[in-house]
Amino acid sequence: MKHSRLFLFLTFISLVGLSTFLNAQFTGKQSDWKGFKKTVFKVGEYEAFVVQPKEPAKDKPWVWRARFPSYHTEIDEMLLKDGYHVAHVNAGRRLGSPNALKIWKQFYNLLTNKHGFNKKVVLEGVSRGGLYVFRWAKAYPETVACMYNDTPVCDFKSWPGGKGVGRGAQGEWKRVMEEYGFKNEGEAMAYRDNPIDNLEPIVDARIPIMHIITEDDAIVPPKENTYILKERLEKLGHPFFYVISIKNGKPSTNGHHFNVESPQIGYHFIRKYSDFSNEYPIYLRSGLKNSRHVFSKTKKGRVGFLGGSITESAGWRLHVAESLQKRFPQTEFDFVYAGIGSTD
């Protein structure tokens, strides 16, 4: 009997200790970040931070900002309100190299093992951050819930190399040579493990990806980056690649920066693919901006009319269909009339 009590007591202490361990508090310099607590600390010699939600969601979902974590934070703020953590480690000017991967692995292990963060993370890659997130996703696809990338670099020959139509950045191109250990430019040009290469691990893991780009981006031209990636993923049969295209970015940044008008698009994408509960996601309607984007960009649209006798009658649905055709004259619509009358 005494042995049983001792066993139960030790088990209780063990469980309490494990719970405390997995919910260890972050120590470091704390500050306010848009109403949330931000803690800055070191991972080895590298500075990192975590922004904590006021009430963590079940299963501790989190967003990992690769680079420029203070740029386009609208989606992060929305996710923090839903209980997500937001994290970043500054790996320096390593441009997504294998050396950067070692730093990232240390950071990931710290957050998941010591602080109980979810094993599957949402990756966010802004600009050169694309080099980091794809390096990680191909090396550790089982750890990625989804990827949301903002004007991402998908081939360092395009940026910083400037070997296509993009402007390039010679200082960063030299850094690529040093960081990746290339002896000459020929080796860099022959390198075949950019984000656009060796995509099978991402396809096999069926990792959902969304890119938001500007068509007039002269720094990271989409034709040399996102669209090559898109074509190769489609050839491999990857069904979860989405592109949000903006016609013009800011002239002051050669089209590379832009204002986020509809952060709900990226927010809903992330929520859909990183909701680890068994609850069916329900999103309140927040306008028709998504539909407008599809109608304007793809010139195609499918509109379904669902309802009872009012929907079945000719007046209302035909009026809406006519209005859409006038509003988007270049768009080819497929109207699905599925109203069912409630009376005979």
Walk through the language-model features, giving the residues of each.
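Alpha/beta-hydrolase active-site loop
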Residues: 95-116, 135
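A domain-start/cap signature at the N-terminus of enzymes
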Residues: 24-58, 171-177, 275
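The feature captures the conserved acid-bearing segment of alpha/beta-hydrolase catalytic domains
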Residues: 166-227, 231-234
